[in-house]
Amino acid sequence: MAKAKFERNKPHCNIGTIGHVDHGKTSLTAAITKILAETGGATFTAYDQIDKAPEEKARGITISTAHVEYETSNRHYAHVDCPGHADYVKNMITGAAQMDGAILVVSAADGPMPQTREHILLARQVGVPALVVFMNKCDMVDDPELLDLVELEVRELLSSYDFPGDDIPIVRGSALCALEDKQPEIGRDAILKLMAEVDAYIPQPERPKDKPFLMPIEDVFSISGRGTVVTGRVERGVVKVGEEVEIVGIKNTVKTTCTGVEMFRKLLDQGEAGDNIGALLRGTKREDVERGQVLAAPGSITPHTDFEAEAYILNKEEGGRHTPFFTNYRPQFYFRTTDVTGVVALPEGTEMVMPGDNVKMIVTLIAPIAMDQGLRFAIREGGRTVGAGVVAKIIK
């Protein structure tokens, strides 16, 4: 039988493996590529190739991440796997590898461990929409009651972090058996069952173009006789000529109308996600708009000053701070295109934050910024990046 051609006409989804060290995340990643390669949906990538993941820089932070791609009959997947725990923390917080869903790997022999908990919490804080669980190393457990116990424990843990623990699919298997062609019911078959659950349970992400319009403003020009033009790259959605838009953030929200869209000096009927455009705004004065504000579909986003964040603080080797910081630390928070000063309050029980730590914190900005949950930011001191974070919850 000829192999099916690798086509890009299927819906695309970004996923990753998360879970405690040595529970088998990388083995599972290798096993998925091996089993799907049988039907031409992947190229087998061995454990060693995934494990020596190259280092990448995202927002000035060094992260090691392995990327593999594969497809099922329903979808095309880009899958990320990180060698070390710190890489996961950085990856999830910076959004370097955006995850539409994740496979939580738990060893049946050990049950949930500290990093299992931490990765679930991070997934919740950074807004990973859905998880599927792979209970790995089932070949090492003889007692089926023990497997039931571990499953119960995992479900309770998921529920305690506001994931639907009762509904999340948990697939039992062994990545090693799949890689070594042993015990197909927990090897090959379990991998196929896992991928069927991922296909069915992880929702298809909305394409950026289908979301409400938003464009971070990078520059503002005044064109005599025409009005004010704002430029930027459309982050999501579509803006059509003649539509009403809002200017949000820093100052009071103002409504205006987009009377023209220009790209590469050509006039267009609309600008959409990914386009670098200039938008002509009716009746808006040059001094009423500034970099750092956003142009958005009316009512789709609101400005806020107070939020709870999950942040990673760079260590000395990454070019970060050399000393810890405490409550009332006042750095700049860089959102999209601009820096805003903010004050940090640390949670009770956290006295200080050391370089290299990840931390939950409450931030109060001196000016409101257009934000929603999941927005990424950099923490800077005089233009130098000292951390990265994500808005976990808006307070006001």
From Swiss-Prot:
A GO cellular-component term linked to this record: cytosol
Domain (tr-type G): residue spans on this chain: 10-206
Q: Which PROSITE patterns match?
A: G_TR_1, G_TR_2
Primary enzyme class: hydrolase
The record's principal subcellular location, in a coarse class, is cytoplasm
Where does it localize? Cytoplasm
The lineage's top-level taxon is Bacteria
> Keyword annotations for this protein?
Cytoplasm, Elongation factor, GTP-binding, Hydrolase, Magnesium, Metal-binding, Nucleotide-binding, Protein biosynthesis
- Binding of Mg(2+) occurs at 26
Query: Does the UniProt entry include the keyword NAD?
Result: no
Annotated region described as G5, given as residue ranges: 174-176
Region entry G3, spans? 81-84
Residues covered by region (G1): 19-26
Transmembrane portions of the chain? none
What EC number is given for this enzyme? 3.6.5.3
Q: Where is this region: G4?
A: 136-139
Q: What segment(s) does the record annotate as region G2?
A: 60-64
The free-text function statement in the UniProt record for this protein reads: GTP hydrolase that promotes the GTP-dependent binding of aminoacyl-tRNA to the A-site of ribosomes during protein biosynthesis.
Record text on subunit structure and interactions: Monomer.
Kindly give the NCBIfam families that the UniProt entry links to this protein. EF-Tu, PRK00049.1, PRK12735.1, PRK12736.1, small_GTP
- Name the UniProt record assigns to this protein: Elongation factor Tu
* Species per Swiss-Prot/TrEMBL record: Paramagnetospirillum magneticum (strain ATCC 700264 / AMB-1)
